[in-house]
A protein has these predicted regions:
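Anionic group-binding determinants
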Residues: 1-187
Length: 187
């Protein structure tokens, strides 16, 4: 008698598998985490994406991740040069809502983070800057891992819903909303 369990098809989620294919491994590491909100913000810019959004003509997104809560804030950008305006908006909203100040900003030292106006704002606001080496993704692992999680999540969402890729910002917004309302091991 043949075992009926062996004849059942393997439940494989093809959109999940397709979205998790990567080029390089970003190692996970347990480091000490800051305990206060806004004590450390990780940031990274992703893009350009090969297709612009259906509304707004966006090609990039920038992430701001609070180290203590792992709360994600994401903004769409048309150009890399829009990153500073996105940071100013994030800083104003986060500091106002949490009644706290950003103490440290960690980024990958990309050109979008190195403008004179960005440096001046951080200096006058008392924000310490931490830059990683450009080729060492693991040094900015929180932001890099978040972007990787975004790519996997939105690819899965778009594939599962059979939506065209120009809906990527809608998927990023939805994915962020779901993440920020889900329990994490941090909390």
């Amino acid at each position: 008698m043949q075992n009926s369990i062996l004849t059942l098809p393997d439940p494989i989620c093809e959109p999940c598998i397709a979205s998790k294919q990567t080029r390089a491994n970003i190692p996970k590491s347990v480091n000490s985490r800051h305990s206060g909100l806004l004590e450390l913000i990780h940031s990274d810019l992703h893009g350009p994406l090969p297709v612009q959004t259906r509304i707004g003509a966006y090609h990039y997104w920038i992430t701001f991740i609070d180290d203590a809560s792992r709360y994600w804030t994401v903004a769409p950008l048309k150009h890399k040069s829009d990153a500073f305006a996105a940071f100013k908006a994030f800083k104003a909203l986060a500091e106002n809502q949490l009644n706290a100040r950003i103490k440290v900003l960690h980024d990958d030292k990309g050109g979008e983070y190195m403008s004179k106006e960005w440096e001046e704002l951080c200096t006058t606001s008392g924000i310490k800057r931490i830059h990683t080496l450009r080729a060492e993704l693991y040094q900015n692992r929180v932001a890099e891992y978040t972007n990787r999680t975004f790519k996997e999540g939105i690819t899965t969402m778009l594939n599962k819903a059979s939506l065209p890729s120009f809906f990527w910002w809608d998927a990023v917004s939805t994915f962020t909303h779901i993440h920020n309302r889900s329990l994490t091991s941090i909390l």
